[in-house]
Amino acid sequence: MSHYPASGTWQACPKCGRHVHQRQWGTYQQCPYCHYWQRLTTAQRLEQLVDEGSFQPLTMTERPVNQLGFPDYMNKLRRAQRQTGLNEAVVCGTALIEQQPCILAVMDSHFMMGTLNTAVTRRLLHASEQARAQRLPLIIVTASGGARMQEGVYALVGMNLILAELARLAATPLPLITVLTDPTMGGVSASFAFKGDLIIAEAGAKIGFAGARVIQQTLPVKLPADFQTADQLFKNGMVDAVVERPQLRSTLGQALVNYGIGRSAHG
């Protein structure tokens, strides 16, 4: 195993273990040796997806609350906020992608694994409500380990609240596009990740419910090598397309053109 750190000037690739200089990862954060894709921060994802200067955050005041009195939860939250510069695991706003307007929500797995809680739920609800109010397509980029255990049933209720709001969105002509990135697991994959009119999986993404290790500890089965991969889901008809990271922006832009909602609603 490499002695190189997980971050810094030189970094060990999590997949192949080779030593990669930060410049070698490139704009799209891909290992030059094994082509492993690094997980992106929200800032990196926005930089790659939206037209320069077009992203305008929605006004959101929701903050996480320790309703269950879970030990050390608030300390973990503050630590995640310091490390990421975010106040929660999703950022939502209006944006242009290839000059096409949309409402965009981007989850960040660096913030407590992008887990779904009451604050993230309210932000996603607000994003969908704004899509309906402004008559814009909604794009959700998922990157999550599932529901946040520190908020227990309150986090699980969020799954149904989001599904109910997306049902209201589905009753309009407005499209929902979901982009499943690594990881998309647990309660997020079990709820809204697969509700898109168009479901795109980023190449190399791990997508599923329970992890492979948990499944193998529970059931005496040998899982296939491509288990819970974007390619496997595409092969089985669970996603509409698998797209390499450098092509995501143009793919989304073309999809928005094809739907023709944003420009027709906004001139």
From Swiss-Prot:
Binding-site residues for Zn(2+), renumbered to this chain: 13, 16, 31, 34
Alphabetized GO MF terms:
acetyl-CoA carboxylase activity; ATP binding; carboxyl- or carbamoyltransferase activity; zinc ion binding
Localization in the cell: Cytoplasm
Per the UniProt entry, the Enzyme Commission number(s) are: 2.1.3.15
Which reaction is catalysed here? N(6)-carboxybiotinyl-L-lysyl-[protein] + acetyl-CoA = N(6)-biotinyl-L-lysyl-[protein] + malonyl-CoA
Q: Which SUPFAM superfamilies match?
A: ClpP/crotonase
Q: Which Pfam family, any one, appears in the UniProt record?
A: Carboxyl_trans
Major place of residence: cytoplasm
Pathway, per Swiss-Prot/TrEMBL?
Answer: Lipid metabolism; malonyl-CoA biosynthesis; malonyl-CoA from acetyl-CoA: step 1/1
Q: What class of enzyme is it?
A: transferase
What is a single cellular component term in the Gene Ontology annotation? Answer: acetyl-CoA carboxylase complex
Q: Name one GO biological process term.
A: fatty acid biosynthetic process
- Stretches annotated zinc finger (C4-type): 13-34
Q: How is the cofactor bound?
A: Binds 1 zinc ion per subunit.
What the entry lists under InterPro entries is as follows: AcCoA_carboxyl_beta (IPR034733), Acetyl_CoA_COase_Trfase_b_su (IPR000438), ClpP/crotonase-like_dom_sf (IPR029045), COA_CT_N (IPR011762)
Q: Which cofactor does it need?
A: Zn(2+)
| UniProt keyword annotations, A-Z | ATP-binding, Cytoplasm, Fatty acid biosynthesis, Fatty acid metabolism, Lipid biosynthesis, Lipid metabolism, Metal-binding, Nucleotide-binding, Transferase, Zinc, Zinc-finger
- Identify the residues that the record assigns to the CoA carboxyltransferase N-terminal domain, covering every copy: 9-267
Disulphide bonds annotated for this chain are none
Q: Does the keyword Transferase apply?
A: yes
Q: Which PANTHER family match?
A: ACETYL-COENZYME A CARBOXYLASE CARBOXYL TRANSFERASE SUBUNIT BETA, CHLOROPLASTIC
Q: What does this protein do?
A: Component of the acetyl coenzyme A carboxylase (ACC) complex. Biotin carboxylase (BC) catalyzes the carboxylation of biotin on its carrier protein (BCCP) and then the CO(2) group is transferred by the transcarboxylase to acetyl-CoA to form malonyl-CoA.
Self-association state and partner proteins as the record states: Acetyl-CoA carboxylase is a heterohexamer composed of biotin carboxyl carrier protein (AccB), biotin carboxylase (AccC) and two subunits each of ACCase subunit alpha (AccA) and ACCase subunit beta (AccD).
Report the family membership.
Belongs to the AccD/PCCB family.
Q: What is this protein called?
A: Acetyl-coenzyme A carboxylase carboxyl transferase subunit beta 1
- Name the species this protein comes from: Lactiplantibacillus plantarum (strain ATCC BAA-793 / NCIMB 8826 / WCFS1)
Upper taxonomic lineage: Bacteria, Bacillati, Bacillota, Bacilli, Lactobacillales
